[in-house]
Amino acid sequence: FNAKKQLLEFLSEDIGRGDITSQLLPKRNISARIITRQIATVAGSRYAKEIFELKGCSVKILKKDGSKVKPNDTIMVISGDAKKILSCERTALNLLTRMSGIATQTDQLVKKISNKKTKLYSTRKTAPGLRYFDKEAVEIGGGGKHRLRLDEMVMIKDNHIAVGGSLLSLIKKAKKKYKKFEVEVENTVDAVLAAKEGATIIMLDNFSPVLIKKTIQVLKNQKLRHRVILEA
């Protein structure tokens, strides 16, 4: 992942051929601050800093990623040509606020999980271009990463089964090539099948809390629960 390349693309997307409004202003050096409006967990400060620096500005970070902030705290101070600061402020703020929002919500959710063995993970359901930033924000908030890319681990889902014929046949193929693989199931019967056949991880897709509890008990009764990691 080339963060600098991605940040330059973000800037190009917003600035286009130039910030024609800021070009109306006289040349003037200024100092600007990014101030918080609410209680939050900071994430993305280093990327916001890099965005400003790519335009030739100087940045001093006062609240690093992972910092807990309250209203009116200063996250960073930016110094430099006013035109340059104004041309990239929105790109920097958008990424900083997005990542901080994700980190803040993740932190709140993690604190609600009473069972310390239970972990909160992010999925691949992210907007193109933002995956690495979103997943890093989840980690800063106390969560973990699921797959970043399709080449990291086999994950057999409903559409694969629809094309491939059956869950069992795909599991057997996966077992021949990979030590670790995940299976998404839609019912308890398939969860048991996946566990018996050696799935490392089983995703209980759209299971209600009641059905999750029932499935866990069935796996325990058949002495299969210890074999697998469950996701829901």
Show which residues each predicted segment covers:
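Short acidic, S/G/P-rich loop/turn micro-motifs used as interaction or catalytic elements
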Residues: P209
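Short secondary-structure boundary segments
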Residues: N206
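Acidic/glycine-rich phosphate/pyrophosphate-binding loops and surrounding catalytic core
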Residues: F1-E197, I201, K213-K214, V218, ...
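Intrinsic disorder/low-complexity segments
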Residues: N221-L224
